[in-house]
Amino acid sequence: MGIADFLLQNKGFKDLNQSDTDALSTVCAEETFKAGSTIFPEEGAGDKMYVIKSGSVKITKKVKETENTIAVINPGEFFGEMALLDGMPRSAAAKAGADTVVLSISRDNYTALRTKTPQTALKIVDILVKVLSNRLRQANKNLEVISFWIE
């Protein structure tokens, strides 16, 4: 399956039409990671976002020298999306949980897409805002549960 078709069938990109996925596919690169390999380290450069085609990715955060898995990302889902928006260092690490194939979108390529097809780029930002909002809501729920047990 080609990149544009994969994106078109991906529920995360359901708001994109064929023309949008065609444009987006031109700025995607396919990358492969072996199980256990680091995709990006915590505090590493925030220069790409990723969409999982196959495999899985563990998002980990180091707390007091202990690496904790905070999320497992599966095919069709994305991670590292804050890099497209702010370019800041990574807040967590990403490691392949299995042999994994991802599509990556670099910040530079996204900037080029914004210039070439601004409507598509705006739709992508809308998608990322929804994803980040959902993750923030979940983090708030998790904090509520933690604070209940601490009190």
Predicted feature residues:
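Cytosolic regulatory regions built on CNB/CRP/Popeye-like sensor folds
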Residues: 1-151
